[in-house]
Amino acid sequence: MKKIGLSVLISLSVLSGLGVSSCTEIKRGEYAKGSATIFCDDGFKNILDEEIEVFEYSYPEASIIPFYVSEQEAMDSLMANKTQAVIVTKELTKEQKEYLKTKYKRIAKSECIAVDAVALIVNKNNPIDALSMDDIKDLLNGKITRWNQLAASDTTNLTLVFDSQGSSTVSYLRDKFLPAGKKISDNTIAFAQKNNAEVFDIVKKDPNAIGVISVSWLGDNLQNAKKVPMNERMASYENQTDTVVSNLTTEVKILKISNPTEENDFSPTSYAPYQVYINSGDYPLFRKVYMISTASNSNVLYSFYTFVTGFVGQKIISLTGIMPYHVNRRVVELQTNKK
């Protein structure tokens, strides 16, 4: 039987008028050399690892040293001038920009590089397929603690696992679902891990766990790309005429999310965090990802900043399963033959 698959085809072309450059344009400059650090929320580790590897392959005299930390630690490091670049999910306030300018003579540049989604995952043998936004709110507030409260027959207690305190994922869910002053860690079924990788591994092994994780950790395409020799990967990344098909992992079950409203309360549709639904806004748990730099134009970080917001950098992001920000997007659902 022919069914509509949930893979997404993205036609990539960099938006004009944004002041971003291609890989070859950076080569004409003098500043794709030297070393610098960047602090990144751990949720976006997969993205940054590949961005750095490709950038350093293109510019052998450049070295970008990443530190994967909580979003709070990344922002604190930027404000203390311990680094001149971060990848986070919030922009600097006017007061923060003024502080950096007055204290350290730093002018902050900020660019949205992607639209990420927060996913809820369970063991692939778990019978639960979908949650509503109200379910998530009750989970985070401790009102739901057993599987049979989520339409399953199992009366076993569930556990909620997430990455470290201070991460962008924790902040996003706290601000969206919890009353002021309340923390996810106040919930007796919630357990913090060191990073997203640990969340993924726990859910793979534990049928009673619900994991909260960035969708960028769930894309299959980037992992497959890493198996290809770098020269072939580079040629593919620089190809401006091809398309990208984004698929998510099957090692865990990725829950669909519904957002009941007055209009659809009786039959709300549940959506998985595929790019087509992130792009349309139908998947309700999404947020922007920003790269912020205080480096001067003569610093290697400026070249890296330009690279990430250019065509190659944006194409790398598209392979992670989240939406690159600086591209024209033509998204279609692909037909696949399934029994």
Labelled PLM ranges:
Residues 1-36:
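Bacterial Sec-dependent N-terminal signal peptides
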Residues 3-5, 17, 64, 100, ...:
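Generic hydrophobic, helix-prone segments enriched in Leu/Val/Ile
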Residues 17-19, 105, 337:
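Short, flexible coil/linker elements and helix-boundary hinge sites characteristic
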Residues 23-72, 76-79, 114, 122-339:
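Exported/periplasmic ABC-transporter solute-binding proteins
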Residues 71-104, 218-221:
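Pocket-flanking alpha-helical
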Residues 86, 107, 122-125:
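A generic, residue-level signal for flexible/boundary positions that often mark functional hotspots
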Residues 92, 106-112, 118:
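Short, glycine-/small- and polar/acidic-enriched structural segments
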